[in-house]
């Protein structure tokens, strides 16, 4: 019976992670709220690594063609200086640059964030901040595409991503808001945001992979972890595909409304 409880518990959290990771409502914030509301407590740091890895796998699957093209053209530009591969080469460079702020800030301030910025009230405040950002860009229609990006754009979007280390600040929301305020087209902002998710997640996974082996709960939670991984992967794939359709229709304001409602309810009742 206890094993069934653990499986159900991690299934719920995995579905939460998968649903909220791609869309701009903060997966980390919703995991904090889910644990609080359902009386759940995650045993061990491995769970966070596990579900992030599952979401990463789903993003890799969806953007596989972009990744293949970027890799091919990036190498082509390095060895042949082919002009038609130049924009993809620099797109990769800008992704690397945009990864740095979150990596540096995460390493330097991880303990502070864990101790002071992961409370339920902080999640409520951060969700309201996310809502404001999404509302501001609700009607923006940029003109800049992949080939128009610059180092300044990469740094600004990277700093926006670093803000999402705070639960309640959506990573996809923060990066898309920053990108669209810089004049990027919606599809360019979306692609840059989720391709940027890949190196950040890989970096975090590689830096913390030993924590999985050291997790004292791994033996008892192996099956629940696998259930959570599968649930997160499937839900992330579905959720990201759905979000891409929402972006194409310009309906980001609904996510703003949602974040306002959840943020206010969190501050009032939790």
UniProtKB/Swiss-Prot annotation:
GO process terms (BP): cell wall organization; peptidoglycan biosynthetic process; regulation of cell shape; response to antibiotic
Catalytic activity: di-trans,octa-cis-undecaprenyl diphosphate + H2O = di-trans,octa-cis-undecaprenyl phosphate + phosphate + H(+)
GO function terms (MF aspect): undecaprenyl-diphosphatase activity
Pfam families: BacA (PF02673)
Subcellular location: Cell membrane
Record function comment: Catalyzes the dephosphorylation of undecaprenyl diphosphate (UPP). Confers resistance to bacitracin.
Other noteworthy facts: Bacitracin is thought to be involved in the inhibition of peptidoglycan synthesis by sequestering undecaprenyl diphosphate, thereby reducing the pool of lipid carrier available.
Protein name: Undecaprenyl-diphosphatase 3
UniProt source species: Bacillus anthracis
Record gene name: uppP3
């Amino acid at each position: 019976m206890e094993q069934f409880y653990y499986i159900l518990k991690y299934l719920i959290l995995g579905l939460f992670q998968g649903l909220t990771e791609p869309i701009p409502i903060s997966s980390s914030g919703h995991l904090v709220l889910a644990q609080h509301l359902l009386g759940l407590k995650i045993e061990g740091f491995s769970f966070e690594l596990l579900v992030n890895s599952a979401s990463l796998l789903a993003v890799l699957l969806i953007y596989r063609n972009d990744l293949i093209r970027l890799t091919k053209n990036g190498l082509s530009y390095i060895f042949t200086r082919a002009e038609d591969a130049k924009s993809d080469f620099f797109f990769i460079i800008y992704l690397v640059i945009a990864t740095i702020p979150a990596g540096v800030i995460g390493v330097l301030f991880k303990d502070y964030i864990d101790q002071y910025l992961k409370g339920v009230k902080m999640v409520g405040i951060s969700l309201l901040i996310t809502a404001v950002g999404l509302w501001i860009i609700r009607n923006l229609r940029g003109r800049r595409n992949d080939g128009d990006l610059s180092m300044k754009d990469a740094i600004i979007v990277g700093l926006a991503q670093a803000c999402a280390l705070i639960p309640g600040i959506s990573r996809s929301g923060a990066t898309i808001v920053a990108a669209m305020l810089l004049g990027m087209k919606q599809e360019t902002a979306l692609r840059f945001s989720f391709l940027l998710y890949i190196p950040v997640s890989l970096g975090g996974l590689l830096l913390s992979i030993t924590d999985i082996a050291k997790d004292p709960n791994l033996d008892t939670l192996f099956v629940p972890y696998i259930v959570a991984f599968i649930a997160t992967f499937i839900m992330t794939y579905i959720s990201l595909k759905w979000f891409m359709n929402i972006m194409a229709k310009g309906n980001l304001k609904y996510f703003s409304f949602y974040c306002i409602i959840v943020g206010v309810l969190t501050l009032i009742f939790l």
